[in-house]
Amino acid sequence: MIISASKDRADNMSIFLQKLIVETKWLNHLQPTNEDARWSRISFDVACPPHQAPSVKSLGITSQLTGSRADFILLDDVEVPGNSMTELMREKLLQLCTETESILTPSDDSRICFLGTYQNSFSIYTRLAERNYKPFVWPARYPRKTESYGGLLAPQLYEDIEQGANPGECTDPDRFDDED
């Protein structure tokens, strides 16, 4: 399940995933082989045993979650300036986000993953650790002072630094370069 601040944003992620399945050779096996499988841009199945719920479904954060079930929930940029300006708005948003826990299937493999950018110093992302999530930060460049991240720097980046990555270098050169 993909949840974003807006339904459009979540739909775009769903469309992107569907495109990856079709166009990436090593993901082609995920295309459904059954004619009855769902294959719309906002809700589709991958090649797997039949299930009542679609394999992938996109929703906006204020959409109705009741009745949905998911093994993996991706909350992608649920916090935006328009829904996080005030403390009350952030509390409501955090409550909506944690409601996803009730639709997560009870399995050792089930996961909830947040991807997002802090919108202000009171971001809901800073409060996820209080709710037993393991947050980490992945900046575009290796930091000069890792301690300024309060222990939240991504574990992979700590390893890279220990292995010689230099402060100021891009953490993901395929995505960012010195022009970004």
Where is each model-derived feature located?
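A structural signal for short, well-ordered beta-strand segments and their strand-loop junctions
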Residues: 2-4, 57-58, 74, 113-116, ...
